[in-house]
């Protein structure tokens, strides 16, 4: 059972990386964290995936004063998403024409929601950024929604100022990722009967 959950976790994280790579190739806007990662990548010359990994480690260090404990899923989230994103960015060609760019964005968004549901449903630990929201909730009593909004507004603004791409894809992500995860989650959650909070 543990092995199957771990496989589901890895598949979910790879799907997330694939979805993120497609949204990068669409050039129509990324989710807030990847806008930040893209901006930092432009600034430093490091790959998007490597910046994602370093960012994940930095965010996880913020767990220490919040007394959050990482799980196996937390570590896997940091490493697998970053590596898979870099791999898929090598394999996926640039979109030629607006029709293909929109297709990349839509498919990327759906795969990101599917991947998120898969790794959450495996119940093996939150990602570093989700864990930060939970820690802020426990430490200061802020709602997870408010915590997420504040943190993502900061990273979005910072990433955009550094040259990250924000646009219609960013808005679509903000509006649709929650409903997509909620739609896919039961299929991945039920086999293990893992109780996870709603997105």
Positions of predicted regions on the chain:
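Core subunits and conserved enzymes of cellular information-processing
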Residues: 1-199
């Amino acid at each position: 059972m543990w092995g199957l959950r771990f496989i589901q976790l890895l598949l979910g994280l790879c799907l997330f990386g694939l979805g993120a790579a497609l949204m990068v190739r669409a050039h129509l806007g990324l989710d807030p964290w990847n806008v930040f990662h893209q901006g930092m990548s432009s600034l430093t010359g490091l790959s998007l995936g490597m910046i994602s990994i370093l960012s994940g480690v930095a965010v996880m260090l913020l767990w220490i004063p919040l007394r959050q404990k990482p799980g196996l899923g937390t570590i896997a989230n940091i490493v697998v998403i970053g590596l898979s994103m870099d791999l898929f960015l090598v394999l996926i060609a640039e979109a030629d024409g607006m029709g293909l760019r929109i297709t990349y964005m839509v498919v990327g968004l759906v795969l990101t929601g599917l991947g998120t549901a898969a790794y959450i449903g495996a119940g093996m630990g939150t990602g570093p950024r989700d864990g930060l929201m939970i820690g802020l909730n426990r430490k200061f009593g802020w709602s997870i929604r408010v915590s997420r909004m504040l943190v993502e507004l900061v990273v979005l603004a910072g990433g955009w100022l550094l040259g990250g791409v924000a646009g219609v894809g960013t808005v679509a992500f903000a509006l649709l990722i929650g409903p997509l995860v909620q739609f896919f989650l039961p299929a991945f959650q039920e086999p293990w009967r893992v109780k996870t909070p709603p997105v």
